[in-house]
Design a protein with these regions (language model features):
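Enriched for short, Lys/Arg-rich terminal
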Residues: 1-8, 14-31, 35, 48, ...
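Generic structural signal for secondary-structure transition and capping sites
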Residues: 42-45
Length: 91
C-alpha cells in the first residue's frame, strides 16, 4: 500500500474546470471522480479505475478511468498528489 498520508492534494485550474463541467453535465461522472480522488489519496498506485502509469509527454503521471472515454490524470511526488485533468484522454 502506498504511503499517502503525508501528501497534500493539489487541484489544478484545468482539473477544477473539468469537475465543474461534470457537475453540470453528468453528476454520475462527477461522483465517480470524487470516488477516484478518495481512492488515489488512500493508495496512489492501486485500486479502482485501473491505475496506469503514463509515458512520453506525461511521463511521471498516472491515469484512472472515469468512463470508457475519459480519464483522471494525476501526478504523485514525495509531498503532494496533483490532480491535473478529469476530461478526455491525455492532453
Amino acid at each position: 500500500m502506498s504511503k499517502t498520508a503525508d501528501r497534500i492534494a493539489v487541484v489544478s485550474t484545468h482539473f477544477r474546470e473539468d469537475l465543474r463541467h461534470w457537475i453540470a453535465a453528468d453528476r454520475k461522472a462527477a461522483l465517480r471522480i470524487l470516488d477516484l480522488m478518495a481512492a488515489i489519496l488512500a493508495d496512489s498506485f492501486a485500486g479502482i479505475g485501473k491505475p496506469e502509469s503514463l509515458k512520453f509527454a506525461l511521463s511521471g503521471c498516472w491515469s484512472r478511468r472515469i468512463t470508457q472515454e475519459h480519464r483522471l490524470v494525476y501526478r504523485v511526488t514525495a509531498d503532494r498528489i496533483e490532480f491535473i485533468q478529469a476530461r478526455f484522454h491525455y492532453e
